[in-house]
């Protein structure tokens, strides 16, 4: 089997993080980037080992039929609309969190993906980071006892600057 072909929709901060992670895999390659923000595309190219095809709209990417896996890393409120088109491909999907931004879209997601033949995964890649993976292993082994509660405080600026400040003043 050849390399798994990834298409990344949204080449901002999270899209670039996925590119860097895909670069660590032996049998995987990014074959396409999709973003209407040219500066984000150019930044993503710096992390790539190859020269992928570039698309400004996800429907054009879908029509090209070049990917085995689609990663949706666009502004949160756009995930459901892109997903409605992407599910026609029956390819594997990785969708950045949050999957949806309202309850209505969650129910719609459940309805349109019922029986979907590909793998659908909401990105929770931190669980594979070595410190987190070790922590999970320790919990599962019982070495710290029966866990009752767990709390994490994240020490970073919560609203990174994004294209058009979509994460600060969005729908």
Ranges and model annotations:
Residues 1-49:
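N-terminal Rossmann-like dinucleotide-binding module
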Residues 2-4, 118, 145-148:
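Nucleotide donor/acceptor-binding cores
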Residues 17, 43, 60, 69, ...:
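Alpha-helical elements of Rossmann-like donor-binding domains used by nucleotide-donor carbohydrate transfer enzymes
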Residues 30, 51, 67-70, 144-147:
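Local beta-strand N-terminus motif with an aromatic residue
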Residues 43-51, 108, 112-115:
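Short, conserved SAM-binding/catalytic segment
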Residues 52-58:
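Conserved SAM-binding strand-loop segment of SAM-dependent methyltransferases
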Residues 62-64, 68-76, 80-127, 142:
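Beta-strand-loop-alpha-helix segment that lines the small-molecule cofactor/substrate pocket
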Residues 126-171:
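Predominantly a Rossmann-like dinucleotide-binding segment in NAD(P)-dependent oxidoreductases
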């Amino acid at each position: 089997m050849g390399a798994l072909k990834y298409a990344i929709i949204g080449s901002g901060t999270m899209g670039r993080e996925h590119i860097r992670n895909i670069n660590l895999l032996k049998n995987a390659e990014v074959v396409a980037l999709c973003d209407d923000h040219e500066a984000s595309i150019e930044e993503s190219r710096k992390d790539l080992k190859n020269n992928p095809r570039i698309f400004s709209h996800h429907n054009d990417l879908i029509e090209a039929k070049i990917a085995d896996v689609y990663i949706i890393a666009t502004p949160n409120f756009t995930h459901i609309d892109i997903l409605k088109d992407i599910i026609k491909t029956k390819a594997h999907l990785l969708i950045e969190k949050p999957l949806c931004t309202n309850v209505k879209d969650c129910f719609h997601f459940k309805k349109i993906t019922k029986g979907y033949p590909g793998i659908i995964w909401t990105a929770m890649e931190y669980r594979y980071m070595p410190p987190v993976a070790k922590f999970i292993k320790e919990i599962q082994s019982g070495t710290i006892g029966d866990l009752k509660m767990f709390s994490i405080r994240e020490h970073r600026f919560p609203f990174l600057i994004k294209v058009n400040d979509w994460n600060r003043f969005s729908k």
